[in-house]
Amino acid sequence: MLSFEGKVSSGLQKAGQFMEKEVYKKQYLDKLGFIPYHGTLNIKLSNNITLNLDNLHDKLKRIHGNGSFGDVLFLEAYLSTIDEKITKKGAILFPVKTVYDTDTLEYVSSEKLRDTLNLKDGDKVIIKIEK
């Protein structure tokens, strides 16, 4: 597994709007295996790490958008508290149309992870993805 650290950060509070769009909503359960909470947990990667999607091309899956809303690529992943006592399965979303740099990830899960894991901005987390 690939493992890397990041810090929880606040986003633009817009992901929930997109998560609720019918064009995406119908595909979440089939492709992610769960219905995601209607927002993302933003994670700023540590130590100038960026995720090179070219190296993970065979692991990426796609949620199809339409003319107004772009496709969303995703990787199945696991997010853990820094002490690794609690791990939650989810996915890292890579919207084709995004405002974030490659060092900020958008993580989704079936739960509101800020509440479930008692996370706040600046808290460190660990993300793991299959190689």
From Swiss-Prot:
Catalytic activity annotation: riboflavin + CTP = CDP + FMN + H(+)
Keywords noted in UniProt: Flavoprotein, FMN, Kinase, Magnesium, Metal-binding, Nucleotide-binding, Transferase
EC number: 2.7.1.161
Chain segments annotated as coiled-coil in the UniProt record: none
Signal peptide segment: none
Cofactor: Mg(2+)
Family stated for the protein in its record: Belongs to the archaeal riboflavin kinase family.
Name used for this protein in its record: Riboflavin kinase
Source organism of this protein record: Methanosphaera stadtmanae (strain ATCC 43021 / DSM 3091 / JCM 11832 / MCB-3)
Encoding gene per record: ribK
